[in-house]
Curated annotation (Swiss-Prot):
A cellular component term, taken from the record's GO annotations: cytoplasm
Binding site for L-aspartate: 124, 128-129
Source species: Cronobacter sakazakii (strain ATCC BAA-894) (Enterobacter sakazakii)
Pathway given in the UniProt record: Amino-acid biosynthesis; L-arginine biosynthesis; L-arginine from L-ornithine and carbamoyl phosphate: step 2/3
Protein name per its UniProtKB record: Argininosuccinate synthase
Quaternary state and interactors: Homotetramer.
Amino acid sequence: MQNHGIKKVVLAYSGGLDTSAIIPWLKENYEGCDVVACVVDIGQDRDDLKGVEQKALRSGASECYVVDAREEFIKDYVYPVLQTGALYEGSYLLGTSMARPLIAKALVDVAKKVGADALCHGATGKGNDQVRFESAWAALAPHLKVIAPWREWNLRSREALLDYLKARDIPTTASLEKIYSRDENAWHISTEGGVLESPWNAPNQDCWVWTVDPKDAPDEAEQVTVTVEKGNVVAVNGEQLTPFGCLEVLNKIGAKHGVGRIDIVENRLVGIKSRGCYETPGGTIMMAALRGVEQLVLDRDSFKWREQVGLEMSYVVYDGRWFAPLRQSLQAAAQSLAEQVSGEVVLELYKGRVTAIQKKSTNSLYNEEFATFGEDEVYDHSHAGGFIRLFSLSSRIRALNELKK
């Protein structure tokens, strides 16, 4: 055992197997170290939070802070990213990626409160989360030391972790039968490992937690009305709700209809490909609602720019660069465009699908008089010829040059 000069460490604690083992490990390997557990409530399973403080104390923590960050998560992290339309590699709605900087910030706040000189996370050396946590801490609290047990200890399996806790009489609900690795918050739940480790294996039914199988969803479609103000969802079916409240309602409706499932192989930041089943029912509905309003109010160049902002934002958030200037710049760009993104969308949910079937906005650029396929008195078809000639001028010049050769 060594002292390492660390007197008090704040641990990102979940109550799961890994972080339950980290508490006694810290006390055994950092002599005289005081461990403060910090649980950040971002909408994970309520059962996981029951008794979590007592569990942390029984594992050896001197204190346990439970931070309710549910509204903050959706309002200050999810909504700004949603405005950009960010989808990592075209499909992932960044549920885990958006949560990590918030958790990291909450730990820094607790560290300042208790006078800690170190921070600790339970992310493995193979994953993205270690980068996200430590990049955030480098930006927010560069003076604090960082402890990453998975890069130090020799406990390399669930069996080893269970034996470690058993030898110290520390109770845990974990077992060898729980073969999946899951991450859950208000926005999504992810499932990895087990049968999913082979991309040739189809997911089992137990790979999905929130959503019903679309084949078993109701045979009748359901319509839901979503109200958007300046790029933020503010009401569902006419009822004004908080950001977290809107998501709660849409999660329930979407899950019932099997909405928001994806099964993907993604490129991790650390160079490994990983496979996961992700469920984001409410988020999928919100994304469809925002895109529906955008189609009405954004001109062609603005829409194209928003798509570029979303693509870049997906990588910035996924890579753990939340507190970097680029993320702030991208968010500012999206918020500027979102000033016009207000309206109402009716979406139809049916067996896993979300379809915007009605949309309106006072800022709409859609004009029926111009768009009609019938006879109109506002559009002179002869004007199109000059536009096309100028638009295709470079192609015409290139072709003429080729004829001269």
